[in-house]
Amino acid sequence: MRTKTIGLLSAAVLLLCLLTGCGKTGDRVRVAVITKATNSDFWHGVQSGVEAAASAYAADVTFTGPDSEEDYAAQNALIRQAVEDGADAIVLSAIDRQRNAAAVDEAAARGVKIVSIDSAVDSDAVALFIGTDDRAAGRAAGEAAVAGFVSPAEIRIGLVNIAKETANGAEREQGLRDYLSGVPNAKIIAVEHAENTLADATAAAVRLLREYPQINVLIGFNEWMTLGVGAAIRDADAAARVRAVGFDANVVSVAMLETGEMDALIVQDPYAIGYLGVRYAVALAGGEQAPAQPVHTTVATADRTNMFDKDMQKLLFRF
């Protein structure tokens, strides 16, 4: 009789485990955040937001990215590994909007919810995009570029951008071009595409200044491109003749803004991007519907006239 009772108890416990998931961490949602890299202040800001949301929403969250922001194949491997590791949702900033699409589609086919942050991917499986309105940010860069000139002065612009295949760089450049179409005295002279390293971005900016001496505006389209633009202007002692506009904020670029190598920074909110990415990933994994429209985070233009304003300090001095 004792043996039979124990057997019945064991069967009951086994059934309870099957129904409730013994061995799992409660009902915690598993979220894999996969960014383009992890080695810049921008991504550190995203990670801070991710970690805060993981705590707030009691989620099991991993944060990974390739060593290089050009290595889409490594990013695809991380996507596939996240699926094998049992992720309920993936939050992705895509390196290549086309070459990352197949891995995203495969993950979605396995039931994983997909949230896109910062840089989009060409996949219908994406439930929601969260990040900067990059067209609007590009227009803001155009406005900042021409602000230092009195019409009809000739404005000759050089661009230092990231890879053509990366969605946010392409969108920012298009927004800039849209804005400049209404400025008849402004013209883009040349575009350089650089890898996401200080050395490569600086070399690209130096080439523009050397090969096109008529350039009087340089624009860098992300954190690394901005640092390269600032370094090239500093090394050429060109701050008095070349207006510089960049994206993002770290201790170096903010110092360049204060000392004059940079004239304006288009500042994003990476903390909010990371936080909201996890917040919506948890909601989607729990069966909630995604918002009908993209969730756009704050973007602001900082210059020497407003960089110490209270609201701007929150964006500029998060490092």
Q: How would you describe each model-predicted region?
A:
Residues 160, 164, 168, 179-180, ...:
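Hinge/cleft segment of the Venus flytrap/periplasmic-binding protein
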Residues 42-56, 137-144, 167-186, 200, ...:
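Short, solvent-exposed amphipathic alpha-helices that sit
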